[in-house]
Regions:
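Basic/polar, cationic surfaces and motifs that engage anionic cell-wall
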Residues: 15-24, 122-128, 136-205
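N-terminal catalytic cores of peptidoglycan-degrading enzymes
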Residues: 7-122
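N-terminal amphipathic/basic-hydrophobic helices that include classical n-h-c signal peptides
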Residues: 1-14, 203-205
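Conserved, mostly hydrophobic/aromatic
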Residues: 131
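Intrinsically disordered, low-complexity N-terminal regions enriched in serine/proline/glycine
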Residues: 4, 78-79, 159, 187
Length: 205
């Protein structure tokens, strides 16, 4: 017979697993040097959703990987000259085809949010996991990206005491615009289990 709803959810969860080292079993791991230890005793309580493409609005290349591993060639594209010396990373990068690349263990602090504040608490990198979707503010994301993001989110929420999900623009308003107007928050929220975290607004003054 048909699986009950809860069993279907459980089977989805089994697709992805994060081990004690903070690594996702379905991701390709490419270590970024742009990370460090979280402050002692910090609980992971926030997911931050971003978009990124390098060069801007171009997909499938190695630009994002090069950026997160400090191998960007400033001569490769005019835009890259503005990235010289930038040291950034995210925990996860979800490509257009749904492939996941992990750059930093979830146990460690990735450098994705920059100057940021969530509900009165500064330094979001300390207590968050950063997920970059390959995309831009002017390009709709793919069906596969939503499916993978939803499954990854549920996996992370099972593993860590995550209480909130926010966009980069929510934690750095006025400075950042991603994941942008093309990201369908309603689709993302509705894909999560009904008892899952709902995105709340940033109450920071």
């Amino acid at each position: 017979g048909k699986l009950p709803y809860t069993d279907i959810q459980l089977s989805l969860h089994s697709i992805m697993h994060i081990d004690a080292a903070g690594l996702l079993d379905t991701a390709q791991f490419i270590a970024s040097p742009n990370c460090d230890e979280r402050p002692t005793g910090t609980e992971i309580s926030l997911l931050v959703i971003h978009n990124i493409s390098l060069p801007p609005n171009e997909f499938s290349g190695q630009g994002v990987i090069d950026l997160f591993t400090n191998r960007i060639d400033p001569q490769a594209h005019p835009y890259y000259q503005s990235l010289q010396g930038l040291k950034v990373s995210a925990h996860f990068f979800v490509r257009r085809d749904g492939t996941i690349i992990q750059f930093v263990s979830c146990n460690d602090r990735a450098w994705h949010a920059g100057v940021s504040n969530w509900q009165g608490k500064d330094r979001c990198n300390d207590y968050s996991i950063g997920i970059e979707l390959e995309g831009s503010d002017i390009t709709p994301f793919t069906d596969t990206q939503y499916e993978v993001l939803i499954t990854l989110t549920q996996c992370l929420c099972n593993q860590y005491p995550i209480q909130h999900i926010a966009g980069h623009s929510d934690v750095a308003p006025g400075r950042k615009t991603d994941p942008g107007p093309c990201f369908d928050w309603e689709r993302y929220d509705s894909g999560l289990r009904r008892d899952f975290i709902k995105r709340s607004t940033n109450s920071t003054p």
